[in-house]
Structure formats: C-alpha cells, structure tokens
Amino acid sequence: MSDSTTIARPYAKAIFEHALAEKKLSEWSEYLTLLAQVVLTPQATQFIANPASTDEQQIELLIEICGSKFKKNDALNNLIKLLTTNKRLMLLPEIKALYEVYRAEQEKILEVDVVSYSELTPAQQQRLSESLSQRLSRKVSLKISIDPSLLGGALIRAGDLVIDGSVRGKLNMLGTSLAA
C-alpha cells in the first residue's frame, strides 16, 4: 500500500460518511471527479507546486474553476480549504478513487473488467451484465476493453473471480494438459 493511499483514506472515508448522511453520494462523486481532473491539469499542478502561490490563491482558483455549485456548498469549500492547508490537493485523484470504492460497497456495485476479442453489442453487454449480477448477487458495472490477442471469446475479472472464456485461454489449458 502506498503512502498516498494511507494518507488519502481518512479523507475519502470522511467524505463518504458525510455524503452518505446527506444522501448525496452521486453528487459527491461528481464533485470529486471534477476536482481530481482539475488538479491533474498541467497548469493546476504547476500552480499548486509553486511555493509562491498562497493557500488562499489555490482555494480561490479551485472554487472559481469548479463553478457556482461549489460556492454554495460549505462542506465542499471546507474540504478544499482543508486539503489546501494540509498540502494534500494532489491526493484528490486517490481520494476520489477510494471514495468510489466505498460508494460501490455501499451500493453493492461491483466493477467487472471484461476483455473481449471483439466489440460487444449492447444486447450482449446487457445479457452479460444480467448474468453476472445474478451470479454475484450484486449490481455490476462493466468496464469493457478489446484485445484481439484473445483469438476469440472473453476474459472476465470481478474482484478475485476470473472467468477465462477466451480461445487463447482454452488453447493454453489444452497445451498444459497435453504436456502433462
């Protein structure tokens, strides 16, 4: 576990607990996504790293860039001030990622990586999503990528469950059994 994860975890947990209490999980996802994107821009990274920029300037810049909804949200403004004062703004992408893990656990959503030989049609994606939801007893969020080296089929990873339905995987198993 990296130091940044260890440092980001309490922030993410506190934000999650606040969002849960306020019943605003999706809104806070949007806020954190926007903040994480902003701090990763080269200009913002340079400005934040510049010792000549004050905490007040950094806070003002972030609130200005992020728009009017930030000006009306005291909790969000307090978060920005806290992260700025503690020199933790660059942890926002990590905080956002940890927040999303907490949110997925709360909403019983499991992110499933699907690597397919070819593009899946919307109907195939729907069937796959329904089948996995039923098998795993959770809602699933599919993250689909294409890999022609599979030769056909798909490779599915959901947490520590791996389903290798690829032609390449079957050929590897056949080769292993023939070699034994």
Swiss-Prot record:
PROSITE patterns: ATPASE_DELTA (PS00389). The gene is atpH. Belongs to the ATPase delta chain family. This is ATP synthase subunit delta. It comes from Legionella pneumophila (strain Corby). Pfam families: OSCP. It is found in: Cell inner membrane. F(1)F(0) ATP synthase produces ATP from ADP in the presence of a proton or sodium gradient. F-type ATPases consist of two structural domains, F(1) containing the extramembraneous catalytic core and F(0) containing the membrane proton channel, linked together by a central stalk and a peripheral stalk. During catalysis, ATP synthesis in the catalytic domain of F(1) is coupled via a rotary mechanism of the central stalk subunits to proton translocation. InterPro entries: ATP_synth_OSCP/delta_N_sf, ATPase_OSCP/d_CS, ATPase_OSCP/dsu.
